[in-house]
Amino acid sequence: MKVNHAEIVISAVSKKQYPEDQLPEIALAGRSNVGKSSFINRLINRKNLARTSSKPGKTQTLNFYRINESFYFVDVPGYGYAKVSKKEREKWGRMMEEYFQTRDTLRAVVLVTDLRHDPTQDDIQMYDFIKYFDLPVIIIGTKLDKITKNKRQKHINRAKQVLEMDETDLFIPFSAEIGEGKDEAWSALSRYIKR
């Protein structure tokens, strides 16, 4: 997909702040600092629409990015960052649950994981959380370029096994650095962003 227009519209903390234009939405979930912002930036060929951070736990809101006036990427708070207080984690949990449960324009969730390592307990919990709400999920295994070619399939198989992925869910190996997996990601997303 060629992206001609991309902008951050709002950083929301509750549903009364969500955009009201009824465009389809794709949520992006993943551990803090796993590469969600880099994933967005690579897909849309922009260096810094989604701000990348060296500080984990920086995204504390639902960030709505309108793409081509036709759909939204919604970056949800990263999880698994130990220095965030329990109270703060609970607040994020409620915010995400409200979004996943009540948002009828939410079409699918992209779960971003680090392909170099086994999915964490938090990744498994998030995958199960998404499935609980009966939402389509696409797993993006980032940092593909950091794994030697002869070990990639082993890492992919292991990630699928640890997550106990449904066969109907897609797993796409991806590199924000070199763009590998970008076409496959757009192809997977395109079925959910048509109105």
Swiss-Prot record:
Pfam families: MMR_HSR1 (PF01926). Transmembrane segments: none annotated. Gene3D superfamilies: P-loop containing nucleotide triphosphate hydrolases (3.40.50.300). GO terms for cellular component: cytosol. It comes from the Bacteria. Its cofactor is Mg(2+). GO terms for molecular function: GTP binding; metal ion binding. Keywords: Cell cycle, Cell division, GTP-binding, Magnesium, Metal-binding, Nucleotide-binding, Septation. The keyword Cell cycle applies. The keyword Nucleotide-binding applies. InterPro entries: G_ENGB_dom, GTP-bd, GTP-bd_ribosome_bio_YsxC, P-loop_NTPase, Small_GTP-bd. Mg(2+) binds at S37, T59. GO terms for biological process: division septum assembly. Residues 22-195 form the EngB-type G domain. GTP binds at residues 30-37, 57-61, 75-78, 142-145, 174-176. Belongs to the TRAFAC class TrmE-Era-EngA-EngB-Septin-like GTPase superfamily. EngB GTPase family. Necessary for normal cell division and for the maintenance of normal septation. This is Probable GTP-binding protein EngB. It comes from Oceanobacillus iheyensis (strain DSM 14371 / CIP 107618 / JCM 11309 / KCTC 3954 / HTE831). The lineage of its organism: Bacteria, Bacillati, Bacillota, Bacilli, Bacillales.
